[in-house]
């Protein structure tokens, strides 16, 4: 059971009838597959449990998800990082910043703020970097 398999499951679960209203709700900022949150969560739960056993972040998976057009892939990446946040290191902060500012909208920022907050709580020396973010 690989994270790549999860991407295939997401594609198989797409529902074009639901995609339209989801796109409208997000003011047509992003295309959607039409997979609602509860269904999406059920799909990725088992993959994230398996991924935790590796005790390391798969940044290639995160980047692959972030580069895909449908918004659900960014949700998967952000929630993957939330599930794996205890394995983040302070060296991951620039990668997180890139996600926060790329394809940025309230929906993914609301997930990533918890991930960044957890990292900074574990590494208080990063607070200065967050202050710089707030000024940019």
Question: What positions do the PLM features span?
Answer:
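Alpha-helical scaffold domains
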Residues: 1-136
């Amino acid at each position: 059971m690989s994270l790549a398999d999860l991407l295939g499951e997401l594609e198989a679960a797409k529902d074009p009838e639901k995609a339209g209203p989801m796109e409208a709700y997000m003011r047509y900022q992003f295309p959607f597959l039409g997979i609602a949150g509860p269904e999406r969560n059920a799909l990725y739960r088992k993959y994230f449990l398996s991924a935790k056993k590796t005790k390391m972040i798969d940044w290639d998976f995160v980047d692959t998800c972030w580069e895909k057009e449908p918004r659900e892939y960014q949700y998967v990446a952000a929630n993957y990082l939330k599930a794996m946040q205890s394995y983040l290191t302070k060296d991951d902060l620039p990668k997180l910043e890139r996600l926060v500012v790329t394809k940025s909208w309230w929906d993914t920022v609301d997930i990533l703020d918890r991930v960044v907050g957890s990292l900074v709580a574990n590494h208080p020396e990063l607070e200065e970097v967050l202050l710089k973010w707030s000024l940019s």
